[in-house]
From Swiss-Prot:
Cofactor note: Binds 1 zinc ion per subunit.
Stretches assigned to the tRNA-binding domain: 619-725
Binding sites annotated in the UniProt record for Zn(2+): C158, C161, C171, C174
Chain positions of motif 'KMSKS' region: 348-352
Name recorded for this polypeptide: Methionine--tRNA ligase
Amino acid sequence: MSASDLTSVQAGAPQGRRQILVTSALPYANGQIHIGHLVEYIQTDIWVRTMRMHGHEIYYIGADDTHGTPVMLRAEQEGVSPKQLIERVWREHKRDFDSFGVSFDNFYTTDSDENRVLSETIYLALKEAGFIAEREIEQAYDPVRQMFLPDRFIKGECPKCHAKDQYGDSCEVCGTTYQPTDLIHPYSVVSGAAPVRKTSTHYFFRLSDPRCEAFLREWVSGLAQPEATNKMREWLGEAGEAKLADWDISRDAPYFGFEIPGAPGKYFYVWLDAPVGYYASFKNLCQRRGLDFDAWIRKDSTTEQYHFIGKDILYFHTLFWPAMLEFSGHRTPTNVFAHGFLTVDGAKMSKSRGTFITAQSYIDTGLNPEWLRYYFAAKLNATMEDIDLNLEDFQARVNSDLVGKYVNIASRAAGFLLKRFDGRVQASAMNHPLLATLRGAIPQIAAHYEAREYGRALRQTMELADAVNGYVDSAKPWELAKDPANAVALHETCSVSLEAFRLLSLALKPVLPRVAQGVEAFLGIAPLTWADAGMPLSPEQPVRAYQHLMTRVDPKQIDALLAANRGSLQGTAAAAEAGAANGNGAGSKNGKGAKAAAQPAASAANADDGASPIISIDDFAKIDLRIAKIVACQAVEGSDKLLQLTLDVGEERTRNVFSGIKSAYRPEQLVGKLTVMVANLAPRKMKFGLSEGMVLAASAADEKAEPGLYILEPHSGAKPGMRVK
């Protein structure tokens, strides 16, 4: 389908029953779903529901993106296998999507037999067609863990601004991009060791092949978003520039993923098998439902295929993915729809401010998921513009639009209709001019949704709601009800109000599916579709007792949501204070009397069995406790107890501390963690070097009976150099 065809379809009524495959980007299986993710899934779900309401054959496909080094290392950190980790995360992600009404036809995993077979098939087809190259490359290598390191697993000092602890590809302080080899004093995030350079054979997809450039120049002309088209043309350059570079599609063992056929110890890079995971998830669905999978993906398929993504992964979905499909003999995407980023209260999501909001915390705090669906929809359009969740505006808009304008229409009319007219509408009222206006607007609202102009659809819907409320205010049914002589007028007013409410509910159904279900049950009607705009309520079907469909947002709920997501040192201090009052130290792990104990430079101090002497607040104030970030860690040669920690305490230089916690932690487990240190302890010279402080850890009073050491780890949001007080 060309861009002009797509525009014509989006501008008007559906042209016959279409077959459509839709995907959202796959969430990575090493973290929680947050509201930034939900922008995309809600956007996609609204579009899918819109098309279902037209009666099209449409399948919404998703999966967890499960492969790669981060998943492998996260699993190791948690003491589980990668498969155990991704199975747990899949359940968490599925729970969150269900909570927000994201209606996948199949939510699967990229770690599946279907994905392995499809990835191998596509790779071998590309190899047969001459699109796979093999060459030696030099990479950073961790000599301790014996593994090659991705750029983001190398840190060091920025070569430009000299900021510490920066990633191997760019500086978060000054914004400079560079090669990992440019870092000053680089170290492996995995082990803390200095990386070395090592060569390895890698496999490349030859995106630089002239056939790829020719195909992509033609394919880009069909993209619906001008911003995407312009960005792709920038990447492609002018004819003859040859700006496209070959794409490394392989990684070396150890790696969690699929091994490349005929290349032992080499694995597909996650970005090769992740988009193939769209097809794998769909194939799994086809096998269960008896659908013809090949008819949807073969080169001459007449089906449609749309990908909803964030603008940060446009490169993969508009260059690599369509080229992979084209030259492996498959159909290419009909279109790719990219959205912008989410900010909260005008700023990036922040753990310290509590605005890095997880989906589960939103649900646990008792907020209605359809509030957020409505607010995001009101902000979304067909462009790649960023959107902002302003929490004050969120509260005001939901309370005004959904409660004040929309659901109140039903609550104002239902009681009179049930009490006076047995819940049956007046047949003649269904021809009221106001209702004709609403019915006439439904096709345009549906077209706005299909064009991804959700904000326009909702603005038009709320303008209609204003008109309905104006009608009710003018008719004054509460006044009409006082005089039996006004029964006909009262019946008409309530009937017009409820039919208008049905039409508004139809207009809002893609955004508020659960409210729509409640409306359908209340009115005693079948599930609403766009074709039902002209099918008014019937006097033959009485409405049922009205149940509240939506409550107002309480400001206290917003406060509770922020508190639930805020990484706060006050919370840590309060817990320590409460623990002390109960006879337990701040580092209490299990409530069995474990105490916080400082770990001196040489070895872990044994906690005193008895209570410590009482000290004054002045004595305590002498201790300068600071948040420290462990930027490097290594075992001390010749010692079976000590680890050498390099700590960032917010000063111009790092500090060196020896700590007797080797029995409890491997060096790679500690790198990147925050902890608490005594910053004003006099330096101590040891045979291994100078120790410039001590870190804090907890241990049981009787370490022989209950062994274990536990370093103190502040909540997210704490920063190196912050005082603990």
